[in-house]
């Protein structure tokens, strides 16, 4: 029995059907706006969601971690803690360096944060040590964000000190000026300097001290104003030879006289041109190098920034000698571009598959062209809105457009199928278009707004995850909205002009065969549907079981935060015993580097040893392993990491921690592994008590891998205990003691050499090669009040102690970070549960506070809001459907399709070994919007048949199911094929796209089968319930 359409006159589509020229030009305008907008859209890996972050670095060479903490970090933290909009403040105080990282609220502009930081630094200046070589320097950069570009500068003919000087003045400064660059660091520590190495025995023999030498040097090298002479006729500027420029000048410097004979600096010290810090070194593929790391500002577009650097590099390298080679070792934009290209290909493949399925069902070229035009028009038109909203072409927006391919064609399919049905019945194309479009208009509006309603909760997600998916949700919603407009305007107009009874009746052998196939399928479906309607309670039991199963799967499926991406770059930390020297650490780094470079997947390697703003201690080395492009290696990054760690396990005395770089960086500190867990206390003593037991328990957990802590309190220290009474009797102050020690062992920067292009330091130290270790303290001499020379050992004793290698703070309190990775056979959710269980078993005191950080903290936050996100999507859709249908009952019938989609998605994820992460959850939310389309198409026609033809509910829903079977199948397959390329993705960034495709394909497959039977049964059950309520509560009939 055929359901007859109501007599309508085209509704909102009538104007566009009757005015084809205006409609065509309107669509051309949308197309041109999208094409123009596409050209202005920037390209990036992900939407820009970085927290405004500023790093403040203060260098104090020779200072211990305790001194750096109390003299530099603490005063700065007190001022920074008063800034408004500050989200988190972390600091690391190591030997000679203080690094404070300030993370602000997402809503605070970075420029405003910069002004607050500068004001806080100015306020703290008076509290900082007076002998700081340089004031605190801030950079608009997140230290945990990997460099966007790494360059290695090498030379076999020129000393590395000269190479660094050229690179710093000619290359690094120019790159720093590029828009979007936050910080350019030169790893390698080869800044030119004049190094003065005192001979302790020679000084002692001459009755001098290191302080005498320091004072002589600082007094002999000055660069200050001298004034000018203003005569009656002319003015003369005064200058003098007050500066010493070379090591030879310093060798000839007279530091004292003895018996009338001059004592020159060269008599008591070796003076040479060298590096400012001899305990820093960088290597590129085992060759000594200056490694230039370029980091972007938070929020800057990585592609634009890298392109600008690439454009200026040829000009910059031309200014360097030919023997100096500049090599780009890593460029994160290479993988970003490859990932975007792969996603663009998947988008085009999805479009092709969707058009193919349309032709398969319609078996008519003109009828296929119409939705074939609607798809690209809807997608391209979206670009214009994206430009207006300052979006970018990134993996998430392209994923949204790929998924939208299956969505946007649905509306056109529903319109074409309905109009074609009237043409086949003998209606004229124009009359059929008016009648079909008018009849289906409300359905299109229902489909569109109910689907957009699902996306509304994504727009209100908080914190960084909400920012991340805002572009995804808005892009998808815009594409769907444009699709609805196209389907109600262009599609019926084209149907009126391109379709005819003859074109639809024209069939070839394939068309006839496929028609017979579909007729048989519909007949089989009709027979099964009759049986199902005869056993409604059994079908209802199946529907309820899917709901129960979806809840069970939701609870037990492994959960994660964000897929681990293979971006072709691995960040590594090499850990050695805490008392290791620079030379020993450099040799261990060389051994490990030679092993890593032998791996077939590795293309290049940079490594760094020493203490600076990113590396807290000498016993740590930083590595960056650059892999070959994905199509040139056999293994993904996680496999390569496992292989490298196994290979390095054979090197004694080192531990290697590796993690792949990610496009999404939430952390604010450089970590050894992917995830972090912190312990915070009021004192370092409390941490020293509780960190070891917790660390040992976590290392025994199978859910965790590479567990380590940054708590290092076994560094060797020489504690010099001065007899203050004896020192006072001799007229020696504690300042005299500190100065003597600093002069000998602190690589003290005692003077500055000024040139037209740069400034260079004079470094003072004691030559310890003859007397290494603690014996060098016996050579320290002090001057008493009567001018006598007093050895340090006469007034002090030396004790060996252990000391922390660094002191870390979080929001001004001591903290230690436990880093961990998750093994392949476990999920982040299971790892988090294991950590919480270990924490509870230890029963921490109240002054110990624990918290996950970075990605693991974001995972906890996202996990807590996931259920509410799904509930909000369902509630939003119920409200929209209730308003559209003016009914409390029919939206429930439509929403009854959701459990089947949830079960299908969760089963697919489980079978594929994929975690339920935020990407997969977005897929499930989209399924909520997709699968209800089946029910809407059925219920709309059933209600029309009841209302306008007087059919009983069972006959109405039965006929509606048969009548809408083909468009339901078409739209579901279109959505499925739109997601299929994502599920089968294998290229760069596939880890990000695959969970979305798996969840959607699995959910669509199962829901397509079940909802064809469960929806009509639930429709009839609710119809009976409605009648029962009307009889029992006749006064509420209208409300029901």
Swiss-Prot record:
This is Multidrug resistance protein MdtB. Keywords: Cell inner membrane, Cell membrane, Membrane, Transmembrane, Transmembrane helix, Transport. The gene is mdtB. The chain crosses the membrane at residues 16-36, 342-362, 369-389, 396-416, 440-460, 472-492, 537-557, 863-883, 888-908, 911-931, 968-988, 998-1018. Its main location: membrane. One of its GO terms (cellular component) is plasma membrane. It comes from Klebsiella pneumoniae subsp. pneumoniae (strain ATCC 700721 / MGH 78578). It is found in: Cell inner membrane. SUPFAM superfamilies: Multidrug efflux transporter AcrB pore domain, PN1, PN2, PC1 and PC2 subdomains, Multidrug efflux transporter AcrB TolC docking domain, DN and DC subdomains, Multidrug efflux transporter AcrB transmembrane domain. Belongs to the resistance-nodulation-cell division (RND) (TC 2.A.6) family. MdtB subfamily. Part of a tripartite efflux system composed of MdtA, MdtB and MdtC. MdtB forms a heteromultimer with MdtC. HAMAP family: MdtB. GO terms for molecular function: xenobiotic transmembrane transporter activity. InterPro entries: AcrB_DN_DC_subdom (IPR027463), Acrflvin-R (IPR001036), Multidrug-R_MdtB (IPR022831). It is a multi-pass membrane protein. Gene3D superfamilies: Multidrug efflux transporter AcrB pore domain, Multidrug efflux transporter AcrB pore domain like, Multidrug efflux transporter AcrB TolC docking domain, DN and DC subdomains, Multidrug efflux transporter AcrB transmembrane domain.
């Amino acid at each position: 029995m055929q359901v007859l359409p109501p007599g309508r006159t085209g509704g909102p589509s009538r104007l566009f059907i009757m005015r084809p020229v205006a409609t065509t030009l309107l669509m051309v305008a949308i197309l041109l706006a999208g094409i123009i907008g596409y050209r202005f859209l920037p390209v990036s890996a992900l939407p820009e969601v970085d927290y405004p972050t500023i790093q403040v670095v203060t260098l104090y060479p020779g200072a211990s971690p305790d001194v750096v903490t109390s003299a530099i970090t603490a005063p700065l933290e007190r001022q920074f803690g008063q800034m408004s909009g500050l989200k988190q403040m972390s600091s690391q105080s190591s030997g000679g360096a203080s690094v404070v990282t300030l993370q602000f609220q997402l809503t605070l502009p970075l420029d405003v944060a910069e002004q607050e930081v500068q004001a806080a630094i100015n306020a703290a200046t008076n509290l900082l040590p007076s002998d700081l070589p340089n004031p605190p320097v801030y950079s608009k950069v997140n230290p945990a964000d990997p460099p966007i570009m790494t360059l290695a500068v090498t030379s076999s003919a020129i000393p590395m000190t000269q190479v660094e000087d050229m690179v710093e003045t000619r290359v690094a400064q120019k790159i720093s000026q590029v828009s979007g660059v936050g910080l350019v660091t030169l790893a390698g520590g080869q800044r030119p300097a004049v190094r003065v190495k005192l001979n302790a025995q020679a000084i002692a023999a001459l009755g001098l001290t290191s302080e005498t030498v320091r004072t002589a040097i600082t007094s002999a090298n000055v660069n200050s104003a001298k004034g000018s002479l203003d005569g009656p006729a002319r003015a003369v500027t005064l200058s003098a030879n007050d500066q010493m420029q070379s090591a030879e000048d310093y060798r000839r410097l007279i530091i004292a006289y003895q018996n009338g004979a001059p004592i020159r600096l060269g008599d008591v010290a070796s003076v040479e041109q060298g590096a400012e810090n001899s305990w820093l070194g960088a290597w590129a593929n085992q060759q000594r190098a200056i490694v230039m790391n370029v980091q972007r500002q938070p929020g800057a577009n990585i592609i634009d920034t890298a392109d600008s650097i690439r454009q200026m590099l040829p000009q910059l390298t031309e200014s360097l000698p030919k023997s100096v080679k500049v090599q780009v070792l890593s460029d994160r934009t290479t993988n970003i571009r490859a990932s975007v290209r792969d996603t663009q290909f998947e988008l085009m493949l999805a479009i092709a598959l969707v058009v193919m399925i349309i032709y398969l069902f319609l078996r008519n070229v003109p009828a296929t062209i119409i939705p074939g035009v609607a798809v690209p028009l809807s997608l391209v038109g979206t670009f214009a809105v994206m430009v207006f909203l300052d979006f970018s072409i990134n993996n998430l927006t392209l994923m949204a457009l790929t998924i939208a391919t299956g969505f946007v064609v649905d509306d056109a399919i529903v319109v074409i199928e309905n109009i074609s049905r009237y043409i086949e019945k003998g209606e004229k194309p124009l009359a059929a278009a008016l009648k079909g479009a008018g009849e289906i208009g409300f359905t299109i509006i229902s489909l569109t707004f109910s689907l957009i309603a699902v996306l509304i909760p994504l727009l209100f997600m908080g914190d960084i995850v909400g920012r991340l998916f805002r572009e995804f949700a808005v892009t998808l919603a815009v594409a769907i909205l444009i699709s609805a407009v196209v389907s109600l305007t262009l599609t019926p107009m084209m149907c009126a002009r391109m379709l005819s009874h003859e074109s639809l009746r024209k069939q070839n052998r394939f068309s006839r065969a496929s028609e017979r196939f579909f007729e048989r399928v519909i007949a089989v479906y009709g027979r099964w549907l009759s049986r199902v309607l005869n056993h409604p309670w059994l079908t209802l039991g199946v529907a309820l079981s899917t709901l129960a199963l979806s809840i069970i799967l939701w609870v037990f499926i492994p959960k994660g935060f964000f897929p681990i991406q293979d971006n072709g770059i691995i960040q590594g930390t090499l850990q050695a015993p805490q008392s290791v020297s620079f030379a020993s650490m450099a040799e261990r780094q060389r051994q490990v580097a030679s092993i890593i470079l032998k791996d077939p997947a590795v293309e290049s390697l940079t490594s760094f040893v020493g203490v600076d703003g990113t590396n807290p201690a000498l016993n740590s080395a930083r590595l960056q392993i650059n892999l070959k492009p994905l199509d040139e290696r056999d293994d993904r990054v996680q496999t390569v990491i496992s292989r490298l760690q196994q290979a390095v396990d054979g090197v004694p005395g080192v531990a290697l921690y590796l993690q792949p770089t990610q496009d999404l960086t939430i952390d604010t500190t450089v970590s050894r592994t992917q995830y972090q867990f912190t312990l915070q206390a009021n004192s370092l003593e409390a941490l020293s008590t509780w960190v070891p037991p917790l660390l040992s328990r976590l290392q025994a957990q199978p859910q965790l891998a590479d567990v380590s802590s940054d708590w290092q309190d076994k560094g060797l220290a020489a504690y010099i205990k001065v007899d203050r009474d004896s020192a006072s009797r001799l007229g020696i102050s504690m300042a005299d003691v500190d100065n003597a020690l600093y002069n000998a062992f602190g690589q003290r920067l005692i003077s500055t050499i000024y040139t037209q292009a740069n400034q260079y330091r004079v470094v003072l130290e004691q030559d310890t090669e003859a007397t290494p270790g603690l014996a060098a303290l016996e050579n320290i001499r002090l001057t008493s009040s009567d001018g006598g020379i007093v050895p340090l050992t006469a007034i002090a004793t030396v004790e060996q102690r252990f000391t922390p290698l660094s002191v870390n703070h979080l929001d001004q309190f001591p903290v230690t970070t436990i880093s961990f990775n998750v093994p392949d056979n476990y999920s982040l959710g299971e790892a988090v549960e294991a950590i919480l269980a270990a924490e509870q078993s230890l029963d921490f005191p109240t002054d110990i506070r624990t918290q996950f950080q970075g990605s693991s903290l974001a995972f906890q936050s996202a996990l807590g809001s996931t259920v509410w996100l799904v509930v909000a999507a369902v509630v939003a859709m119920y409200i929209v459907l209730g308003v559209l249908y003016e009914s409390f009952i029919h939206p429930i019938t439509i929403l009854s399709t959701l459990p089947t989609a949830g079960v299908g998605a969760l089963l697919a994820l489980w079978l594929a070994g994929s975690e339920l992460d935020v990407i997969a959850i977005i897929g499930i939310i989209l399924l909520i919007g997709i699968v209800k389309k089946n029910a809407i198409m059925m219920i709309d026609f059933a209600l029309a048949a009841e209302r306008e033809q007087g059919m009983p509910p069972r006959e109405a829903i039965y006929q509606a199911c048969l009548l809408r079977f083909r468009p339901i199948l078409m739209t579901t397959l279109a959505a499925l094929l739109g997601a299929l390329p994502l599920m089968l993705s294998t290229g760069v960034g596939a880890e990000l796209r695959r969970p979305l495709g798996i969840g959607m394909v699995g959910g669509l497959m199962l829901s397509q089968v079940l909802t064809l039977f469960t929806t009509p049964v639930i429709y009839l059950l609710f119809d009976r319930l409605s009648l029962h309520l009307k009889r029992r509560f006749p006064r509420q009939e209208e409300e029901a």
